[in-house]
């Protein structure tokens, strides 16, 4: 019997999840950045800048942006590594990748963009100085496999950054639930004409591992000195780990 996994609150066959997630992101790609600004009141930009500040990048370094979508982090990383460095933008979803590529082309930038699965990265071992995945890990079917792949492609001494929605501070749970399950789908319907995708967003956040659980998963994948930093009362957490 085929194994099952969660797609939001639904239980689906593992073989079906990727296609269902793809449908969500094909649907929201064109309005993705606008919705991020609306949903977070612009805070997502601060979260991402904090993540980049924790990357420890220098000119000439190689960075892999997994599930990089519309290239917010890629564009920030490019400023850090300079002309002598490399930033690879990847995403499994072509619609999202196209949005990111087009944004960079409009800015006169031409970094490489690769459509690939974060659970099966087509890159050599011990290659990148830094790997990031922002708001992408929770959509992956086999998170442990994805973390192992990110560990594989990092060079010894390199670091992984996982920026993801997490478990909010308990006194705020009721208000956060109201916002997530009532306002998010409403905004999705009004702005993107797609309430269902934002209902999935709220559900996928609740099903994603919390701070300590994700820390343990990273350690199981081989990362050392794993730590995390909560932002906005735990709405988002940045996990950081190193390959030794």
Curated annotation (Swiss-Prot):
Pathway: Quinol/quinone metabolism; menaquinone biosynthesis; menaquinol from 1,4-dihydroxy-2-naphthoate: step 2/2; Cofactor biosynthesis; ubiquinone biosynthesis
One Gene Ontology term of the molecular function aspect: 2-methoxy-6-polyprenyl-1,4-benzoquinol methyltransferase activity
Enzyme Commission number(s) from the entry: 2.1.1.163, 2.1.1.201
UniProt KW Transferase keyword: yes
Keywords in alphabetical order: Menaquinone biosynthesis, Methyltransferase, S-adenosyl-L-methionine, Transferase, Ubiquinone biosynthesis
Alphabetical GO biological process terms: aerobic respiration; menaquinone biosynthetic process; methylation
Residue positions binding S-adenosyl-L-methionine: 70, 91, 117-118
Class of enzymatic activity (EC top level): transferase
Signal sequence segment: none
UniProt superkingdom: Bacteria
Catalytic reactions on record: a 2-demethylmenaquinol + S-adenosyl-L-methionine = a menaquinol + S-adenosyl-L-homocysteine + H(+); a 2-methoxy-6-(all-trans-polyprenyl)benzene-1,4-diol + S-adenosyl-L-methionine = a 5-methoxy-2-methyl-3-(all-trans-polyprenyl)benzene-1,4-diol + S-adenosyl-L-homocysteine + H(+)
PANTHER family: 2-METHOXY-6-POLYPRENYL-1,4-BENZOQUINOL METHYLASE, MITOCHONDRIAL (PTHR43591:SF24), METHYLTRANSFERASE (PTHR43591)
Family, as annotated: Belongs to the class I-like SAM-binding methyltransferase superfamily. MenG/UbiE family.
Function: Methyltransferase required for the conversion of demethylmenaquinol (DMKH2) to menaquinol (MKH2) and the conversion of 2-polyprenyl-6-methoxy-1,4-benzoquinol (DDMQH2) to 2-polyprenyl-3-methyl-6-methoxy-1,4-benzoquinol (DMQH2).
Name of the featured protein: Ubiquinone/menaquinone biosynthesis C-methyltransferase UbiE
UniProt organism field: Thiobacillus denitrificans (strain ATCC 25259 / T1)
């Amino acid at each position: 019997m085929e194994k099952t996994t969660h797609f939001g609150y639904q239980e689906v066959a593992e073989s079906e999840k990727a296609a269902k997630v793809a449908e969500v992101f094909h649907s929201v790609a064109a309005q993705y950045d606008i919705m991020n600004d609306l949903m977070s009141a612009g805070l997502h930009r601060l979260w991402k800048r904090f993540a980049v500040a924790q990357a420890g990048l220098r000119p000439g370094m190689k960075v892999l942006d997994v599930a990089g979508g519309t290239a917010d982090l890629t564009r920030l990383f490019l400023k850090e590594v300079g002309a002598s460095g490399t930033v690879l933008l990847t995403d499994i979803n072509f619609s999202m990748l196209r949005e990111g590529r087009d944004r960079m082309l409009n800015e006169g930038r031409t970094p490489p963009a690769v459509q690939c699965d974060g659970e099966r990265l087509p890159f050599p071992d011990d290659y990148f100085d830094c790997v990031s995945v922002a708001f992408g890990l929770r959509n992956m079917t086999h998170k442990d496999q994805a973390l192992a792949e990110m560990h594989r492609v990092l060079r010894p001494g390199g670091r992984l950054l996982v920026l993801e929605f997490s478990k909010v501070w308990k006194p705020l749970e009721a208000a956060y639930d109201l916002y997530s399950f009532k306002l998010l789908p409403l905004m999705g319907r009004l702005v993107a004409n797609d309430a269902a995708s934002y209902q999935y967003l709220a559900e996928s956040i609740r099903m994603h591992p919390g701070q300590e659980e994700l820390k343990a998963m990273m350690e199981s994948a081989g990362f050392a000195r794993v730590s995390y930093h909560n932002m906005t009362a735990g709405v988002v957490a940045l996990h950081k780990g190193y390959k030794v």
